[in-house]
UniProtKB/Swiss-Prot annotation:
Annotated RRM domain residues: 7-85
Biological process (GO), any one: response to water deprivation
Residues with PTM Phosphoserine: 15, 295
Functional summary from the UniProt entry: Binds RNA and DNA sequences non-specifically. May be involved in tolerance to cold stress.
Compositionally skewed regions (Basic and acidic residues) per UniProt: 83-101, 226-236, 244-253
Null mutant phenotype: No visible phenotype under normal growth conditions.
Record carries keyword S-adenosyl-L-methionine: no
Induction: By cold stress.
UniProt feature, compositional bias: Gly residues: 111-120, 261-273
Protein name, entry field: Glycine-rich RNA-binding protein RZ1C
First and last residues of each zinc finger (CCHC-type): 128-143
GO molecular-function term, one example from the UniProt record: RNA binding
GO cellular component, as recorded: nucleolus; nucleus; plasma membrane
Amino acid sequence: MAAKEGSRIFVGGLSPEVTDRDLERAFSRFGDILDCQIMLERDTGRSRGFGFITFADRRAMDESIREMHGRDFGDRVISVNRAEPKLGRDDGESHGSRGGRDSGYSIAGKGSFGGGGGGGGRVGEDECFKCGRVGHWARDCPSAGGGRGGPVGGFSSRASAYGGSDGRVDRYADRDRYVDRERYIDDRYDGAARYGARDRFDSREAYIPRDRYASDRYAAPADRFAGGDRYSRGSDRYPPGSYDKARSFERDIAPSAGSDRYGGGRAGGPIRGGGEEGRGFRSRAGAPYERPSRSGGGGAYPSSSTFDRY
């Protein structure tokens, strides 16, 4: 019996359409087969995607592993490994039943094998009990979706089916996904701390003075157009009293000969002091805008007697 148990192999990754006879026919060329079983689900009777073959001698077992591991069988890529009975079990428990809860075997060097009734067991620490590959659980096995699109869900080789030569990336895919999400969340809040409300106002203060509105709205009248206002070009753009100087300069200029509406005057520069001609038209006696006095004095308007007629 020990020789029989030492010649048993595990075949994983089988298509649901593969039967015991198909499996025995494929492996019979390596030697005499004593037993061939595909494990079934207890409730539904469906294939669980793996089985066991017992050869008559060890040489046939080694040759079958060397030739069939990672090869195409039907529309799947299968895995073939040596199976060993679990320790502490007698012969009856070790073999188990096709629809039993535990097959009673482990893959050599991979740890214990315990196929749950619903396919929730595992092979070793990180190996799928359905296909025998490492890197994913049985519930995530690519072979669970049936034979669509080629071997192992459409993958053509054992290495490419699991993202690399060792095939250990699928098991940690979910954990890495949450790690990346946590890293993103941390970076997002770190960014908020770096560019939050405080820095937003600080950056604005770098370009806009704090007293911008105070200087424009509440400055003293004499200092409103002095330096410091952002609309001024210099401190002398609007000097105090410039409007009065302009008006005084206008009064001092003598009217030109041809353009004076009110007569008098001669062309030339400003004439300061003395005489009616040197004075502005607003300061002359009898200016056109001078209000007539009721005393009957001279002026451009009629005397008060004229208004008395009405």
